[in-house]
């Protein structure tokens, strides 16, 4: 690799155009071929003359001259002696920059092992030799001898001998009967004598025979390394070095400081160490020193070479004079400060400046204000050129003088230069691509950059002291791209969700909202206006106010573009907004004839963009901004203490709640409820009280009041206006100002039982203030951590998806995903329309009633189609998705669908992976960090009942219902669901019903929307009996498995099951409740099996032994408070957990087959659950379940594939294995979306799908067929498909594999490109693996290309590459033809053929 990278920077060797980079282990011959000479002395430079010492680390003879074209002794100077080697000092006369590329070497007196191959786990040397790492180290570091050739003695091959044992063996067998060696020589001999082909054959044979999993893994690891060596042409003994390369001196400089001291690179220290020890070792060997001394010196040499390559990897870190660890070669590459991330992936640029930003409301959307001083500095070269061209100056020096004096002509020229020359503005942190946009600069006085207010959302900028950087695109192409792609007017929509991002905010919203308010009894109410001019006239003369109800004629155009007018009931304010709307039949006056909240403004801009195009939208946005600002100013909305309204009923609500809480305390004291239940109920009660106070407050604020004297409607409350319009503040904040602050959380996340009753207007008491500081400080600490975590998540996402580019128009697959609306607790949270908008239909979509076609297969679904689909009541639509796209590299345009930032089908070469990563990572800072500890609040309230979300007929699936003694229907099934069908029999909604719920409807009942279907106790999970009889206890031994707990404060006893396995005596117990029938035998259940109900830990018994029970009665209840207080990972950690595909802590166990539950013999603390398969020929599956977990299945229950045997969060790997890719995709998409939805962030599903596609690129071989693979190998899906195509062609058996889900970090490290992986994480490990396998990087992703300094293969770069490739192949063809002399005819024909291949999309 080095030679090729050297060529990149070497002016004398023209940089060859290369298509790929290969990395492999350097053989000693290769190292010598790079080298220009051996370094024999540890000296660097002579401290008096400052000239480099000969044969030292900076030797000019080896590395080249210090000054350009001048030898060291000064005999030859200047260009004319170029290439001559001075006979006196031996230095070649050439450029001094060769000191950046010429390498040297050190001949080692004894071989040493390369630490990367030794210590980078798994250790390659030890795996290859089939020894443990510890043993290899003992040999290498001279602790043990190893037998390399046992001869006829009783010693074994590779046996380790200590010094004593070796001596004894020599005495016993004689020195020439066997060979035992020590140190790197021994390992070198062993590696050199390996026959790789034979080893590979043996390993394959053993693999086929062995049955043990462990051995298989071990053999596979070894086989992989052996095959890597065979395929790459590397030799194993190259992992032991006899020659150490020395990097060029200018890459490890020695800089003189003032005061005669030197600053040096750490590498020089490390090299000096190696050279010193090497020279000492040579001398010792010449002097024939005793073996022990030589061995010690060899060990030290090994250690010093280790430190040079990777300091601190083994043994102590070598430190410099100031006790700071020395930076080794590995450290130069690693981490944020390493070569990859510091210098190759991001470089500093020239022609840039930064300054504070201020608002520029008089700018147009595509402009920014650039301070004159800054512009003068940034555009200097252009100004010099102009001055020269216009004849103001004849030399650069003169031009410089003119500019420095700031002559008037300079300013005129600056104006010319700047005109139509866009500049890029960037605000750090650049979280998504809208963080850098292009503007046309306008020169402004002062020193601050002026920014257009509408682009603030995209930059996430405000004017409280933010700074921004300006960059000047220099080349014509760069200017073109800036104008066409990055101009702020071309970025109206948000790439994450396709909503407009150029939306007025804050003051503008407030002004527009104020304009659009409609009040009653205003002066001029009921007037009619014929046109807008008349209206302006009336407003100027105060005949009518902005908020009066009037009738006005609004002029617009019809479908043919002819002017039409229509009379609307509206207000003058709304007419003013309507005046700005572009005239279009699809943008009627109704779009603005409503209260202009931020949401409605966004919808209005969206409508204008979809129907009138970009130019009109930009003009409209600019005008609407002006209008908003001017009316916000005129409205004079202020914020006073009296605007915070405290509801009169607050005192009563608080009093009632306090009484309720007292009652709960009493119930607890009477022993009716447990401590946990009391806490939950109290927290609930206060939560409800806070809501109620807030509702009352909102009602007071919203109330319409009239002035008794004038009869006019009183002006609206200003705080309410700000919050309701979406300008600033939320109902939650209003609640804290005027209602009550409510419950607070401790830093641990638990909720404190005593709420804060005061609000900020009344002021908090000392205790309340103290209680509220907890949560507030936690919030600040979280924010600081969040930024770093969110940034790291974005980095991993970008890294995994960076090579996902739109590479072809259509892959023609017939696979896709099924999209349905997402319903949560009966509410539709994401409609089907929103989910399929901008995606490609996989099948024809027909109206289910009329059967007419709505959308043809393979067409993009747009807004109009969505409206028809939703109206037709279609429940599910199959669409194309990036997940199922079958393009080999990247994705195809049809599967991806619409480019959200443009609203058109996606372009070829769009880097959709990076866009996806940014869209998911950018809102990361808005997500919460905390894991929620659920102390009962809202959760419980949500989940205690089911309501019908539609009208229709009930259908109960898997019906299993009993009537209990009170005559109520009880759900006894584990997997029952209540479905609502509409009048056409189409399923509208389906909801699971929890076991033990009371059900209020039955099959065939008609229900209205909002009717209650079922309810259950949210605090406990019941265990119910299906048979009647008498209760008997089994293995419920006092003090061992059941505890009669007497609550100290109440004196009431209750019986609770305790963990019986904690004592040796209780280990064989199986606590259960048995129901016996009249004859005294154990009653039989309807599905076979006995009525024996096993109890889980913490169950509270509800019956006494001997009592009678009937069907549907509760025997025991398990409190769910244990489940309620468990952490739910939310926010950022949850998103990271899903993308990293980690197994959740208490993960669910999912049934792999359909079948019947059978309980096997229990182990000590695990319970055996078997599923007896429903179909023949399938093996039964066994699961082990920890005994303390609430397990609610009984013997004989029927269970379907994919159902939960044990509740919890499922592990994504299980979903993939059991239910397949589509189920996994929908699970991941929904779970990730849920987290973002809670924060109100909208992200399109396709972004998450692109990332999940990247996580699913590998397959695990289940059947190798006739391929090279081994069962259990992880290989690239594409690679396997290619291999299979070849095998099938040859008539052999193809290989089969199961898809494997990798977390994003793992997927990034396993990309085909080693350059990309190395620059991500674990640099040494990645490079070690790549070198052994002799990997080739074909430079397909974005990152690799940036690192080698090319245009990325996306966007314009991709097109250029493609054109260049076609051009080169044409040239080759023509040359070929010329060589053959076949004339031009056939060449032209071939060219024609090739022209047809160029994709049309370019």
From Swiss-Prot:
Its EC number is 2.7.7.6. Zn(2+) 2 binds at residues 811, 885, 892, 895. Residues 1385-1395 have a biased composition (Polar residues). It comes from the Bacteria. GO terms for cellular component: DNA-directed RNA polymerase complex. Binds 1 Mg(2+) ion per subunit. Binds 2 Zn(2+) ions per subunit. GO terms for molecular function: DNA binding; DNA-directed RNA polymerase activity; magnesium ion binding; zinc ion binding. Zn(2+) 1 binds at residues 71, 73, 86, 89. It is an enzyme of class 2 (transferase). Mg(2+) binds at residues 462, 464, 466. GO terms for biological process: DNA-templated transcription. Its cofactor is Mg(2+); Zn(2+). Residues 1379-1402 are annotated as: Disordered. Keywords: DNA-directed RNA polymerase, Magnesium, Metal-binding, Nucleotidyltransferase, Transcription, Transferase, Zinc. It catalyses: RNA(n) + a ribonucleoside 5'-triphosphate = RNA(n+1) + diphosphate. DNA-dependent RNA polymerase catalyzes the transcription of DNA into RNA using the four ribonucleoside triphosphates as substrates. The RNAP catalytic core consists of 2 alpha, 1 beta, 1 beta' and 1 omega subunit. When a sigma factor is associated with the core the holoenzyme is formed, which can initiate transcription. Belongs to the RNA polymerase beta' chain family. PANTHER family: DNA-DIRECTED RNA POLYMERASE, DNA-DIRECTED RNA POLYMERASE SUBUNIT BETA. This is DNA-directed RNA polymerase subunit beta'. It comes from Agrobacterium fabrum (strain C58 / ATCC 33970).
């Amino acid at each position: 690799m080095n030679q090729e990278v050297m060529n990149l920077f070497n002016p004398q060797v023209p940089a060859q155009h290369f298509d790929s980079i290969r990395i492999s282990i350097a053989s000693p011959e290769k190292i010598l071929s790079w080298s220009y000479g051996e370094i024999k002395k540890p000296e660097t430079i002579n401290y008096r003359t400052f000239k480099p010492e000969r044969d030292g680390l900076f030797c000019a003879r080896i590395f080249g001259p210090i000054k350009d074209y001048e030898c060291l002794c000064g005999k030859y100077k200047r260009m004319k002696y170029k290439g001559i080697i001075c006979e006196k000092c031996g230095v070649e006369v050439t450029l001094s920059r060769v000191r950046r590329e010429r390498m040297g070497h050190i001949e080692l007196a004894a071989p040493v092992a390369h630490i990367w191959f030794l210590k980078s786990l798994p250790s390659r040397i030890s795996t290859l030799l089939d020894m443990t790492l510890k043993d290899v180290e003992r040999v290498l570091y001279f602790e043990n001898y190893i037998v390399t050739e046992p001869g006829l003695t009783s010693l074994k091959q590779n046996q380790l001998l200590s010094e004593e044992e070796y001596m004894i063996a020599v005495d016993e067998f004689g020195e020439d009967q066997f060979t035992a060696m020590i140190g790197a020589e021994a390992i070198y001999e062993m590696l050199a004598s390996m026959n790789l082909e034979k080893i590979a054959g043996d390993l394959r044979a053993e693999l086929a025979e062995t049955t043990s999993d462990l051995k298989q893994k071990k053999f596979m690891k070894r086989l992989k390394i052996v095959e890597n060596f065979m395929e790459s042409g590397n030799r194993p003994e190259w992992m032991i070095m006899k020659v150490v390369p020395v990097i060029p001196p200018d890459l490890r400089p020695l800089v003189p400081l003032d005061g005669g001291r030197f600053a040096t690179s750490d590498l020089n220290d490390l090299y000096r160490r190696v050279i010193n020890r090497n020279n000492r070792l040579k001398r010792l060997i010449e002097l024939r020193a005793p073996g022990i001394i030589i061995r010690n010196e060899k060990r030290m040499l090994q250690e010093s070479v280790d430190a040079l390559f990777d300091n601190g990897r083994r043994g102590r870190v070598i430190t410099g004079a100031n006790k700071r660890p020395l930076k080794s070669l590995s450290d130069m590459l690693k981490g944020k400060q390493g070569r990859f991330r510091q210098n190759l992936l991001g470089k500093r640029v020239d022609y840039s400046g930064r300054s504070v930003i201020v608002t520029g409301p008089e700018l147009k959307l595509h402009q920014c204000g650039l301070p004159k001083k800054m512009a003068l500095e940034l555009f200097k070269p252009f100004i010099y050129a102009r001055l020269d061209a216009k004849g103001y100056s004849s030399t650069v020096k003169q031009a410089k003088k003119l500019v420095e004096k700031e002559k008037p002509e300079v300013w005129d020229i600056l104006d010319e230069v700047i005109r139509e020359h866009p500049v890029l503005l960037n605000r750090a942190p650049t979280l998504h691509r809208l963080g850098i946009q292009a503007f046309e600069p306008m020169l402004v006085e002062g020193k601050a950059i002026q920014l257009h207010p509408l682009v603030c959302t995209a930059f996430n900028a405000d004017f409280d002291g933010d700074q921004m950087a300006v960059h000047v695109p220099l080349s014509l192409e760069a200017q073109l791209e800036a104008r066409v792609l990055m101009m702020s007017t071309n970025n109206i929509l948000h790439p994450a969700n396709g909503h407009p991002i150029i939306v007025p905010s804050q003051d503008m919203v407030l002004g527009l909202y104020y304009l659009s308010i409609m009040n009653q009894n205003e002066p001029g109410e009921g007037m009619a206006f014929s046109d807008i001019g008349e209206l302006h006239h009336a407003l100027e003369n105060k005949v009518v106010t902005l908020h009066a109800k009037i009738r006005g004629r609004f002029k617009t155009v019809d479908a043919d573009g002819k002017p039409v007018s229509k009379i609307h009931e509206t207000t003058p304010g709304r007419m003013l907004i309507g005046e700005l709307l572009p005239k279009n039949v699809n943008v009627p006056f109704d779009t603005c004839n409503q209260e202009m909240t931020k949401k409605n403004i966004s919808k209005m801009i969206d409508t204008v963009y979809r129907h009138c195009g970009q130019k009109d939208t930009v003009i409209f946005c600019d005008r609407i901004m002006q209008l908003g600002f001017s009316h916000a100013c005129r409205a004079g909305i202020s914020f006073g203490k009296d605007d915070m309204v405290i509801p009169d009923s607050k005192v009563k609500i608080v009093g009632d709640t306090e009484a309720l809480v007292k009652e709960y305390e009493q119930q607890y004291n009477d022993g009716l409820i447990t401590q946990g239940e009391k806490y939950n109920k109290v927290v609930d009660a206060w939560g409800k009280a806070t809501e109620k106070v807030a509702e009352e407050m909102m009602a007071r604020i919203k109330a319409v009041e009239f002035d008794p004297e004038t009869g006019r409607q009183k002006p609206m409350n200003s705080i309410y206006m700000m919050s309701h319009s979406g300008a600033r503040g939320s109902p939650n904040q209003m609640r804290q100002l005027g209602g009550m602050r409510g419950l607070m959380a401790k830093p641990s996340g638990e909720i404190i039982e005593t709420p804060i009753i005061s609000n900020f207007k009344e002021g908090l008491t000392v205790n309340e203030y103290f209680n509220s500081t907890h949560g507030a400080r936690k919030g600040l600490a979280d924010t600081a951590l969040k930024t770093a975590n969110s940034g790291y998540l974005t980095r991993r996402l970008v890294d995994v998806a960076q090579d996902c580019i739109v590479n072809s128009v259509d892959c023609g697959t017939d696979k896709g995903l099924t999209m349905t609306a997402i319903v949560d607790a009966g509410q539709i949270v994401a409609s089907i329309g929103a989910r399929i908008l901008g995606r490609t239909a996989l099948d024809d979509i027909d109206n289910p009633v009329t059967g007419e076609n709505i959308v043809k297969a393979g067409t993009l679904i747009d807004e109009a189609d969505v409206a028809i689909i939703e109206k037709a009541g279609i429940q599910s639509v199959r669409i194309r998705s990036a997940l199922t796209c079958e393009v080999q590299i990247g994705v195809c345009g049809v599967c991806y669908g619409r480019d959200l930032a443009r609203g058109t089908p996606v372009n070829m070469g769009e880097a959709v992976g990076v866009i996806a990563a940014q869209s998911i990572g950018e809102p990361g800072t808005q997500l919460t960090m905390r894991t929620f500890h659920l102390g009962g609040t809202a959760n419980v309230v949500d989940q205690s009942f089911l309501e019908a979300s539609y009208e229709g007929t009930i259908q109960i699936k898997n019906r299993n219902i009993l009537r209990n003694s009170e005559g109520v229907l009880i759900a006894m099934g584990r997997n029952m669901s209540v479905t609502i069908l509409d009048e056409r029999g189409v399923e509208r909604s389906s909801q699971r019903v929890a076991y033990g719920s009371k059900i209020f409807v039955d099959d065939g009942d008609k229900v209205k929307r909002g009717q209650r279907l079922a309810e259950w106790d949210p605090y406990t999970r019941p265990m119910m009996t299906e048979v009647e009889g008498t209760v008997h206890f089994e293995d419920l031994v006092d003090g061992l498995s059941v505890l009669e707990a007497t609550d100290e404060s109440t004196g009431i006893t209750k019986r609770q099951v305790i963990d019986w396995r904690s004592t040796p005596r209780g280990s064989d117990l199986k606590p259960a409740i048995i129901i016996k029938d009249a004859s005294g035998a154990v009653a039989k259940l309807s599905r076979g099996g006995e009525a024996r109900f096993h109890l889980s830990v913490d169950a509270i018994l509800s019956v006494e032994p001997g009592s009678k029970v009937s069907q549907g009665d509760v025997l025991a209840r398990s409190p769910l408070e244990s489940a309620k207080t468990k952490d739910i990972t939310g926010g950022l950690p949850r998103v990271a957990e899903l993308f990293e595909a980690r197994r959740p802590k208490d993960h669910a166990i999912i049934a792999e087959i359909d079948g019947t539950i059978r309980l096997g013999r229990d182990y000590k603390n695990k319970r055996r659950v078997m599923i007896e398969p429903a179909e023949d020929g399938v093996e039964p599956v066994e699961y082990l379940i920890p005994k303390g977990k609430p397990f609610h299945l009984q013997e004989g229950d029927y269970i379907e594939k994919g159902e939960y045997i044990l509740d919890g969060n499922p592990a994504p790997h299980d979903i993939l294995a059991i239910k397949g890719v589509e189920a996994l995709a929908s699970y991941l998409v929904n779970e990730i979306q849920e987290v973002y939805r809670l924060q109100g962030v909208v992200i399109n599903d396709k972004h998450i799908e692109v990332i999940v596609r990247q996580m699913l690129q590998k397959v695990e071989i289940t059947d190798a067929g006739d391929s090279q693979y081994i069962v259990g190998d992880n290989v690239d899906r594409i690679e396997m498909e290619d291999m299979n195509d070849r095998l099938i062609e040859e008539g052999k058996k193809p290989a089969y594999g199961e898809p494997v889900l990798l977390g994003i970090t793992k997927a990034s490290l396993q990309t085909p490109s080693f350059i990309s992986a190395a620059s991500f994480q674990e640099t040494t490990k990645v490079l070690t693996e790549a070198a052994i396998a002799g990997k080739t990087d074909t430079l397909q992703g974005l990152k690799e290309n940036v690192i080698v300094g090319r245009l990325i293969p996306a966007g314009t770069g991709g097109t250029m590459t493609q054109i260049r490739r076609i051009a080169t192949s044409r040239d080759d063809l023509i040359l070929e033809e010329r060589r053959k002399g076949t004339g031009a005819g056939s060449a032209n024909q071939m060219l024609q053929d090739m022209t047809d291949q160029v994709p049309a999309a370019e």
